[in-house]
Amino acid sequence: MPGNRRQVPILHRDADFLLRALQPDDFVRTSRYENANREHLAPWEPLRDPGYFSVDNARARTLLQVASMDEGEALLLLLLDPDDGEVLGRCSYTNIVRGVFQACHLGFSLAAAAQGRGLMARALRVANRYCFEQLGLHRIMASHLPRNARSERLLESLGFEKEGYARAYLKIAGVWEDHVLRALVDAPR
């Protein structure tokens, strides 16, 4: 199955970052990332109870996420520091639907310390191309809060077109928030 993490190579490696699929033993490094960026990411994510940030919870989540990749339902990628292996960010292609749709949803986050260096734009260019060329997807959908100017600029720079506006779309930081809906569609083949 093309979505299987064992078949996903290292997608990118240079002096700035390594981009590869999540592995079962990544739970410690992802837990460190979540804890170090807890306040930075809180305005853009669902409310998290304190137990969410434990290593045990990270282990359980990682195993579920790896299983979803093994089933071809997701592609979950980590941006890693090439020197120390610490997580700089994440790209999540989830809810992969096959058949006549061939689409997924994209989510992403970047460490506070890694902001403003163009890392996520570079990583998503590589990962989006992989989704189209290797996974055979036709559409990648993403949404962002209207006030999240950084995500808006990033998605626009990658060619994601605005397709709509959804009222009370996702519960973010405890509040049902409106979202701008965007999509990147692969060129017809």
From Swiss-Prot:
Function text: Acetylates the N-terminal alanine of ribosomal protein uS5.
Location within or outside the cell: Cytoplasm
PANTHER family named among the record's database cross-references: [RIBOSOMAL PROTEIN US5]-ALANINE N-ACETYLTRANSFERASE, GNAT FAMILY, PUTATIVE (AFU_ORTHOLOGUE AFUA_3G00765)-RELATED-RELATED
N-acetyltransferase domain mapped to chain residues: 31-182
Record carries keyword Acyltransferase: yes
Entries under Pfam families matching the protein: Acetyltransf_3
Keyword terms of this UniProt record: Acyltransferase, Cytoplasm, Transferase
Protein name as annotated: [Ribosomal protein uS5]-alanine N-acetyltransferase
Family listed: Belongs to the acetyltransferase family. RimJ subfamily.
Signal sequence residues: none
GO molecular function, one term: protein-N-terminal-alanine acetyltransferase activity
GO terms under cellular component: cytoplasm
Keyword Isomerase assigned: no
Known catalytic reactions: N-terminal L-alanyl-[ribosomal protein uS5] + acetyl-CoA = N-terminal N(alpha)-acetyl-L-alanyl-[ribosomal protein uS5] + CoA + H(+)
Domain of life: Bacteria
EC number, UniProt record: 2.3.1.267
